[in-house]
């Protein structure tokens, strides 16, 4: 809560609201999306920026592996829950935080929950590939004149990411942060995608340092993007929309 109190002190007079949810639970994602849609008259920008790295494989109450649930399904469910509000707010923008860690990752659609083979880094890399494929399919389904969807690699940023990963993973992440960039620098591409007129009609792209970049071949697979969307909708119990 300290960062929120700091925001309130430095942004006096600017209306803002805070909504809380457990990002590992599908029901919570649906609830908070419905709550935001009900109370916010318009949404100009949606930034999906949740993420985690877990040392051990555990399932959520929905039967989803935690990395997949937090890093991908949370994005999917919240975005779908806010789709109508975003369309009504046109022009609007959706920004998904991905990562260069997707490079070299592949998806096994017969094992999205990593039951056959789990590794903390492997699961994380897969989830970041999901972010890019989700963005790609989302952009295909949205009218660029109404809502754009892009994703980005922010760089390795010195935040609290990974602090609660558990076991040896937490120690490795903490040590690596000595070489990380500042949160302000890590936010630059997000701010650019959220506000720059240069990308007002750009959609379905992957960015790094405010420049459109080429993701891995696996991240450019339109069939995989469609299949991931269909599987995600089924897992979340969300009707297929065009």
Residue ranges and their predicted role:
Residues 1-160, 235-242:
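Rossmann-fold NAD(P)H-dependent dehydrogenase/reductase core
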Residues 2-3, 20, 29, 169-172, ...:
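Extended hydrophobic/aromatic segments used for targeting, binding, or gating
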Residues 3-6, 36, 134, 138, ...:
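Short alpha-helical scaffold segments that flank and stabilize functional sites
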Residues 9-13, 168, 207-209:
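A short glycine/small-residue-enriched secondary-structure motif
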Residues 107-112, 164-167, 206-207:
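Short, flexible, mixed-charge acidic loops at enzyme active sites
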Residues 127, 151, 173-215, 220-226, ...:
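C-terminal helical subdomain
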Residues 158-174:
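A glycine/serine/threonine-rich, flexible loop-to-helix segment
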């Amino acid at each position: 809560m300290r960062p929120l109190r700091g925001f309130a002190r430095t942004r006096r007079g600017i209306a803002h609201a805070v909504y809380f949810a457990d990002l590992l639970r599908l029901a919570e994602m649906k609830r908070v999306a419905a709550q935001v849609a009900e109370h916010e008259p318009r949404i100009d920008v949606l930034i999906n920026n949740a993420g985690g790295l877990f040392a051990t494989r555990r399932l959520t109450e929905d039967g989803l592996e935690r990395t997949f649930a937090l890093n991908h399904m949370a994005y999917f469910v919240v975005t779908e829950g806010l789709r109508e509000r975003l369309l009504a707010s046109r022009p609007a923008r959706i920004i998904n935080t991905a990562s260069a860690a997707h490079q070299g990752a592949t998806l096994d659609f017969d094992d999205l929950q990593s039951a056959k083979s789990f590794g903390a880094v492997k699961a994380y890399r897969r989830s970041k590939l999901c972010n890019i494929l989700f963005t790609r399919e989302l952009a295909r389904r949205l009218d660029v004149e109404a809502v754009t969807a892009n994703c980005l690699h922010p760089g390795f940023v010195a935040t609290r990411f990974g602090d609660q990963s558990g076991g040896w993973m937490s120690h490795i992440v903490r040590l690596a942060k000595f070489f990380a960039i500042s949160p302000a620098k890590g936010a630059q591409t997000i701010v650019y995608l959220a506000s720059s007129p240069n990308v007002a009609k750009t959609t379905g792209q992957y960015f790094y340092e405010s420049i459109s970049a080429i993701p891995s071949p696996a991240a450019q697979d339109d069939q995989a993007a469609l299949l991931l969307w269909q599987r995600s909708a089924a897992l979340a119990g969300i009707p297929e929309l065009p």
